[in-house]
C-alpha cells in the first residue's frame, strides 16, 4: 500500500527516472498539458509526481514596425485559421483556437548570424495544450494570408516550436533530467489514488527545483523478464496460431549497483515443482497467466524493465496473444472487437504499471480526448499510410493487422520506427508503461558494440569473460582418491580445479563456464561443447614480489571452483605447459531448444515444468547481469544529465535531440531564440549538393615500418577548433554592416568546396573553389573579468590565505607537504635534464655527464623528504596487509571495528614519524611559494573556463564554444574526482559522466553538419575541419623546423629527367638529372608508399656522397639521400618566366614565403619561390678556340658508333650551311686536337656541309661522348665550361649560337633566343646564360613538349619573372610495369632547386615523425634505445608546439608504433607503446582481424602473418606459418565456427535477390515462419560446396552458395574451403605479403592451393603430388627465403625465374643467415611485458 506520510525534513527529494506528458480535460472540456515525473527516494520509496500549470509556448518573428494593434489583428487571423482547420479536418466540437491563452510582444536575440547584440521583435504564443501548440505551428509552417497586414501571403519565421514542452520546463527550472529534484513539502498535494507508488503528489511546475546534491544514485529497481512459448509443430512459435501460447513468464528483480537478485518470480501454465528462492505461480489458462503478469508488474513497480530482444519478440508476442483473446471473445459474442464491453486489452493495460490508469480515465477524461495516429491503408497500397483521429482504448485497422490506440497518459503498446547510423533501421515494438523505462539489451549492445552475432549466448560469452591468471588442481581427500583409483580408466572421474582470475563480475554460483584457449589468432574451446559448473567463487589474497619494483605487493584474485573430467583435464595440463597459449573463461549459457520446451510442456511433469522455469529465470538473470556488467544505467544517466534529455531518449531517440536540448538551454540563458529550419525540397534551388572539405586524414603510406614512428595528437581537436575561432551561429558575419566593429576581434577561415561525391569543385582555370567565412568575438576587459568572477576570485584568495596561515603556524610536515616538495624538485630536475638531452651543441659524453650530475643534485635536494616518505609508505603497506589478512570468519560489524582500530593506529604511527622533523624557515617559505603558485594557477584556470585569449587579448566565447568549454572543463573536473575516488560505486558514476562529456563535445560539431539537425549550419562544420587541417600542418612544420635530421615520410616527387644543380666540395658546379644522382639503390621502406597506385615494392633510396651539395632556398645544403619509387600519377608542368618543372599532382611547391602550395591549388599569376647560385668562374685550362668548337658541337654537332657487317664504325661531325663558320671551326680544331679535318659537301642529301676528322675518329667520338652526353643521349654543357672563366663561357656561347641560334646577331630584336631539346640540355644552357649576366626567360611548345625556348637579353624583364604563366597537364606516368619511377631528394634545408630555370621546390613532408635515431657509426637504430629516444623527442615536440599554438588548442604525445604495418587508408596494425618501452599491446584499425563480415579463419591466417612480422620480425616464419594454416584449411582441419560469417539484415535493398544473406533469410522464413529473421538481425552463414548443375558461373547467385550453420550441421553439408581462400583470405593476406614479396611470387604461392583444390574436385591429382620433387633443392616463395648465397655474378643472372631477395632486406642478412640489424630484438621483445590484449586488437 502507498505510504501516507513522508519524513519530517522540510524538502522532499527524489531521483528522476522517467518523464511522461499527456493531456487531461479541464472544466471547459479542453485539453490541459500535464507532466509526469517518476523516480525513487534515497530511502527506497517510489514516487509519481503530477506537475501541473505548465503552458507550452513558442515564438514567431514579427516586423519591427508592428504595434499592439497589428499583433492583435495577426493573432485574430491566426486563430480563425486554426478554427477553420479544426472544423474542416478534425472534430467539430473541439476548437483548438481556444487553447491559445496568452500572447505578448517580446524582444530577443536571433541565434543565426552576428548582429552586435541587436534585439528583434517576437510574438510569444502560450497554449493550454501541446496539441494546440503543434496546430498553430503547423499553420505557420506555410505562408499565411493576413489581410489588412500584408498584401500577399507571408511566411512568418517560427522559433523553438520544435522544442518539446517538458524539455523546456526542464530548462526553465534548471532540473537535471535524471538527477535529483527537490520540492518544498508545503507545496505538495497528496493524491494517493493517482498512482500505485509509495508517494503520489500533485505540484505546480514552478515549485519543482533541482537538488544541491546530485552525485548519488537512488536504489532503483530493475526488472528482468523473459517469456517461454510452445509451438504446435517443430518450428518456432507464432503468436497468431491458437496453440502457440505463452506458457511461462519469468521475472528477476535487482537493485541498481548490485549483482545479486533479491526476488524471483515464475508465472507458469500447469503445475510446477517448487524452486528454492523463487515465487512460483501456476495458472490453468494463458489469459490468467497474462493477467497475473500485469498484476505482478503493478505490484513490483520496477523503475526499469529489461529483456533481450523484448522490443522485437517478447512484448509483441504478449500483445498479439492479448489481441487474439479479444478477437476470440468478439467472435464468440458475435460483435465487433471494439463493441466488447470489457476488452482484455483494456484490462491488462489499465492494470499494468505505476499509474492508476482507471483513475486517469474516470477523473481526467483520458478516454474522451482524441488521439491522432498514423495507420497503414491497404486499400491504397501496402506502403500507403494515413493520419486519423480516434478516441483512446480502440482497435483500428492497420494494414492486415489491428492496432490498439490508447492515450499516452496511461500504459499503451507502441510501435516505433528508429533509424540511426549506430542501429540501422529498426521497428521497436514494446509496451510503454509510464514510470517504467523499457530497455532492450539486444538493441543497446547492437548500438554500442560491433559483434559477429547478437544471440544471447554469443553476447554473454563475449562480455562475461576474463583471462585466467592461473589454474590450480586442488588436492583430493583420501576417499576421493580411492574412488578415483577404482575408476582410473573411466572418463567419469572429475578433478577439482580453481581458476584464478581478476574479476568474476556477472558470474554467479551454479552458472556454467567454458574454458577457452587462445593461440594468439583465435580462441577455441578447450573441449568442443563442454561446459563446467561453477560450484563456488571465493576471494583469494596473495603477497608476491613485484619483479620490476622489487617490492612485495598484495594481489587479489577471484577463484572459480569447478570440476573437470579426466579427458579435459589432460588437455588442460598440456595447454598450461605451452607458453604460447593463453587461457580464459567465458560465461556459457545453459540453453534449451524450443523443441525441448515443447516436449517437456507436453509431458506436463511438474519437475519438467520446473526445468523450463529454471531455464527461463536464468535468461532473466543474465539480462540483468549484462545490464550491470556493461554499466548501462549509470552511463545512460550520465549522458542524459549532460544533454538535458529524459533517460528514455537514449534508448528510443536519435543523437540530434540530445544536442538540440543542450544548445537550446544555453540559448535560453543568453536570451537567444533558435529558428525552426526549413528543409529544402529536391525541387528547390540551392547549394545542397555542395559540401566542404572534410576531416584531415594522414595520407596513407602502406608499408612495414621497422623504425619507431611517434604520433602526436591534438586533444579534442574539433571542439577546440570551434573554440579557437569562436565558431557559433550567432557569431557568423554575413553582413558587411557588422564587420570590423570596435570591441570585437574577427576570425577568418578559408574552406575548399566539394561536390556531393566529395570531389573538389574547381574554377575555370582549374584552381579549387574556395569560400571565406568570418566570425566575430567580443573583447572583454580586466574590469569586466574581475567583476564577473569576483566571487570565485574571493574564494581562491580565502583558501590561499587560510593555507598560508596554517603553514606559518605548523611545526611539522604533513604528507601533502612532502609530496608537493618532492614533486617540485622532480619537475625542475626533469626540465633541466630534458634541456640537456636536446642540446645539439653537446656531445653524448658531455650530455651523460651533465645528466648524471643533475640526478645527483636531485637526490641531494629530495633525500630528506624521500627518507620521511619511505617511512610513511612502509607504515601504510603494513597496515594494508594487516587489513587484507583479517579473518574471513568475522562478521561485518566486527570487521568494521577492527579496520577502524587499525586505521587509527596507522594515523598515530604516521604522526610519530612527522613529530621527529621540524619545519625550517626556508622550508616554510618554500611551501608558501607553492601556495602562491597554486592560487595563481587556480585564477588562470577559472578565467580559461569562461574566456579565451587571442594574441594577448581576452575574449568572450560564443554560445557553442561556451558549451564546449563547459563540457570539457566538467570532464576535466570529473576526471580529477575520479582519480581520487576510492568507492567503486561512485567511480562508476563519475566515469560515466566524464565519458558523456567527451562524447557530447565531439557530437556538437557533427550536428552542425547534419542536414536533418535543427542546428544545421554548414559553414561551422566546414570551418571546423579547415581549422583542424591548419593545426595538423602547423604541428608538422614545428617538428620539421625544430628537430634537424627528423624524417618526414609523406613523399613528393618529380620526374627522373628533372635537372638538379649540385656542387662538389672543391667548388665545382655540375648539372645532372635527379635520376643520375642515385646509384646502388636499396629499399627505402618509409617513402612514398601512401599512393593509391604506388607499387610498394619499388621504393628505393640511394645514400648520396657527403662531398656534394644541392642548391636550396637556404643556399647550398647536403643531400641526405635520393629517393625513387614507381607510381601511376598525373604529371603537371608548371611554368614561370624563369622556371619550369614537371611534378606529380601532389608535389609541394613553395611560394616566396616558403609556404607549401600544391600544383592543383596554383593558378595563373601565383608567385613561386625562385633562387639561383652564384656562378663558379675559376677554370681557364680550356682555350677560347676549343670552347668555341665545343659550343658549336653543342648546337649542331653529332658523334657516335654503329654496327655494320664489317664491325663497329664511328662518326663525328659538325653540321652547318655556312662554310665560313665551318672553316673557322676546322682551324680551331686542327690547332687544339692535332688532327686533320675536312669539310664534306652534303648539301644535296642533308642541306648542310659536314666538318669531319680525317683520322682518330674513335678518339674524337669517345672524348665528345664522355663530356657532352648523359645516359639518355641528351647533350650537356661540359662541367669544364660551367666552371670556367667568363671569356671561355662567352666563346662557348658564341660557338653554340653560331650553330643553333634562332636569330642571328644582325637581327635587331633587343634579345636573342634559341630552341633546345631536353630538360638537361636546356638547364645547362640556362645556367651558362645566367652566369654570363643575361636575364633569361623560358617558354615551351605545346606540340613538342621536349623543346624549350630560351630568350636572353641584358635588359630588365618586363613581366613578373616568378609568376606562373602556364599550368599544363602533361600526362600520367606509364601504366606499364607498375608505373614509372619518380624521384625526390631529402636535404637538410627541406627544399631543393629542380627543373629548367631557377625554381625551388619542397622536399618530403609528413605528420608521422621518424627521428632516425642513429648509433655512433651513423647507422639507423630500430632497437629499444631508438624507441625510448623517439618517445622522448615526441614529448619534447609536443611542448614546443604548445608554446605557440593558439589557445585553447593543445597537442599531446599519444603513442609510438614500433613496428608498424600500414596496409591502406585507415587500415593498420602495429605494436603500440605509450610512455614505457617495456609495455605494449597490439593496436589495429580497419583490418580483417576485427571486421565482422570476415570469417574467423581470416583472422587466423592474417593474424599469424602479422604476428610473425611484428613480434618476430621474420618474413620466412610468416611464409611458413601461412603454408601450415592453408594446408590445415584445405584439409578441413578447422571446426565450422571458424567459417561463420554474419551480416545485418536491412529493411530494404535495391536488388534483394543479389544480397546473399537476404536470400538466405527468406529461405529461413519459409522453412520456419515463427523464427523468421527480423530487420537488423545478424544472419550467420557458411559457404558450402553445392552442385549448381549446368549453371554458368556468372549466373550463380551468392545466396545459392550459403546456408545457416545449424542447417549445415543438420544436413551434413560440406564447407567450401576454396571459396574462403579465394574470396576472404587471399586479398588481405596478399596486401601484407606484397609489402615484402614480389606480387607474382605471392600469386604463385596462393595459386598452388587453388589449383590443387580445383583438381581434387575434378578427380585429378595435383601436379605437385604427381611429380617427385623430394630430391630437388627446396625453395621459398619469399624474396627473403633462406638460401645459400653464391657469388655476386651468379646472383645477378636472369636465367631463372626463382624468387630473389628483395633488396630491402639485404641488410638483414649477416653471415649467410637473416638477422635484423637490432641483434637483440627477439630478446628484448621476450623480456618485455606480454601483450596486454592477448593479441586481440584494440580497434579504433
Curated annotation (Swiss-Prot):
This protein undergoes a protein self splicing that involves a post-translational excision of the intervening region (intein) followed by peptide ligation. Residues 480-491 have a biased composition (Acidic residues). Its EC number is 2.7.7.7. Residues 1685-1700 have a biased composition (Polar residues). Pfam families: DNA_pol_B, DNA_pol_B_exo1. It comes from the Viruses. Residues 472-491, 1673-1701 are annotated as: Disordered. Residues 1189-1334 form the DOD-type homing endonuclease domain. Gene3D superfamilies: DNA polymerase family B, C-terminal domain, DNA Polymerase, chain B, domain 1, Helix hairpin bin, Homing endonucleases, Palm domain of DNA polymerase, Ribonuclease H-like superfamily/Ribonuclease H. It is an enzyme of class 2 (transferase). GO terms for biological process: base-excision repair, gap-filling; DNA replication proofreading; nucleotide-excision repair, DNA gap filling; viral DNA genome replication. Keywords: Autocatalytic cleavage, DNA replication, DNA-binding, DNA-directed DNA polymerase, Nucleotidyltransferase, Protein splicing, Repeat, Transferase, Viral DNA replication. SUPFAM superfamilies: DNA/RNA polymerases, Hedgehog/intein (Hint) domain, Homing endonucleases, Ribonuclease H-like. PANTHER family: DNA POLYMERASE CATALYTIC SUBUNIT, DNA POLYMERASE DELTA CATALYTIC SUBUNIT. Belongs to the DNA polymerase type-B family. This is DNA polymerase. It comes from Acanthamoeba polyphaga mimivirus.
